Amino acid sequence: MKVFDISDFQPDDRVGQLVAQGAEGIILKLGETLHGTPTLDSKFIQFVNDVVAAGLPYGIYYVSHARDMAGFMEEAKFINDQVYNLLGGQEPELGTWWDMEIGPVCRDDVWPQLRDAICTMQSWWNNSQKIGIYAQYSYFNQFIDLAELAQYQIPVWVAQYGYFENSLKAEHPELHHVAWQFTTNDETQDENEWYGF
């Protein structure tokens, strides 16, 4: 399944362009914590309306800056509130993803906090199995307890470019692999191979 992910870095007509390229799904940036405040992506509403109008399934991602458990819970509440207020409380078909790549979340004590935030959101969303983690291959290996990740079967969306295979999937088939971001197309547009939930 050909899935792209987009944010306010992309031009206003990007959804139409991706549909023309054969997109089968799109993951939209919901927001990011900026200057300590959870903030809605400036093009989210436009893009989600475009995707719905195109009849494509979509997911959402949130770029975390959480420095501690309180930060994760503030972000979780923001995500929950936006899904309720903007999406009518309907969980996106292609999932809800914690984007783990910014400095504050690159720390040795991040995993228990991220795990507990996801488990809390699962309890809010009727035991949802579509709340997952997006990160680079190196991040999963350095900061995530892979044994627990497999135990909880939290969905995995891994970024790894320039390889002939998804190395995390090959090395850890026990994980719940959902997607592989395999290229940025020269930093113009992220593209993913979607395995599904």
Where are the predicted features?
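Flexible, glycine-rich phosphate/dinucleotide-binding loops
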Residues: H35, R67, F140, E165, ...
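Structural detector of well-ordered beta-strand residues that form the stable sheet scaffold
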Residues: G59-Y61, G132, W157, W180
